[in-house]
Amino acid sequence: MKFIGAHVSASGGVANAPARAAEIGATAFALFTKNQRQWRAAALTPAVIDEFKAACRKHGYGPGQILPHDSFLINLGHPEPEALEKSRAAFIDELARCAQLGLTLLNFHPGSHLQQLSEEACLSRIAESVNIALDKTEGVTAVIENTAGQGSNLGFRFEHLAAIIDQVEDKSRVGVCIDTCHAFAAGYDLRTEEDCEKTFAEFDRIVGFQYLRGMHLNDAKSTFASRVDRHHSLGEGNIGFTPFRWIMQQSHFDNIPLILETINPDIWNEEIAWLKAQQTGGAQA
């Protein structure tokens, strides 16, 4: 079964997110459990936690259908000790919030060396950060997202993801999320079925499908191998419809959240309906 949805707003409180997902016909969703552009957030109260869990039950969302995302401020590979500690503390808090809400996944961007560390040293620092956070929390898997490779961001090569996983001690609590726009911008072609098969065979060889915990389904305004992160609506960018149809028909992508972060929330319901139709080969674009 495919779990298909979008990154919905948690404005007004996390308990509002499940209903917003249900309104667009989603069978999965992503959210921020706090303001993603602030370091601090009010603690989750028992009432808020209960409301969120009740809303998930009401709308039929289990933990495996929900892919929370951490704050954009966090850099688990930061070269400066003070900033690194701040990021690590924030990441631990994000994992703890997910656990409180009964969630089992937390999607994060690996980190940036800021031109002050080698790639290898930064990847090791990221893995160390993950180990520290997993040691201080329970029940939530840290899900590394591939990046487009803008600036000094790491995670744009499958080898980066594998290097982090290799150094994480508890392999049962680490996974990856593949963003199609990021992969395309990083030089992994997806424009034809043959491209998809080649790219994901490479992913399986280097990382392994056993670590795939989620997907971000985004077309790209950015050009191939540009290392620029610019999302677009499905079929309107430089990737096209083909990979999204292909993903819907492959069992490797069953039972994980498949999340839209496309640029027009007004058509998310249409994009979700189109994706659902591709599972049986219907609704050609």
Curated annotation (Swiss-Prot):
UniProt KW keywords: DNA damage, DNA repair, Endonuclease, Hydrolase, Metal-binding, Nuclease, Zinc
Binding residue positions for Zn(2+) 1: 69, 109, 145
Source species, domain of life: Bacteria
Stored InterPro entries: AP_endonuc_2, AP_endonuc_F2_Zn_BS, Xyl_isomerase-like_sf, Xyl_isomerase-like_TIM-brl
Family to which the UniProt record says this protein belongs: Belongs to the AP endonuclease 2 family.
Classification lineage: Bacteria, Pseudomonadati, Pseudomonadota, Gammaproteobacteria, Enterobacterales
Keyword Isomerase appears in the UniProt entry: no
Official protein name in the record: Probable endonuclease 4
Named cofactor requirement(s): Zn(2+)
Residues binding Zn(2+) 3: 182, 229, 231
PROSITE patterns: AP_NUCLEASE_F2_2, AP_NUCLEASE_F2_3, AP_NUCLEASE_F2_4
Keyword Isomerase in annotation: no
Source organism of the structure: Cronobacter sakazakii (strain ATCC BAA-894) (Enterobacter sakazakii)
Binding residues annotated for Zn(2+) 2, in chain numbering: 145, 179, 216, 261
Catalytic reaction annotation: Endonucleolytic cleavage to 5'-phosphooligonucleotide end-products
GO terms classed as biological process: base-excision repair
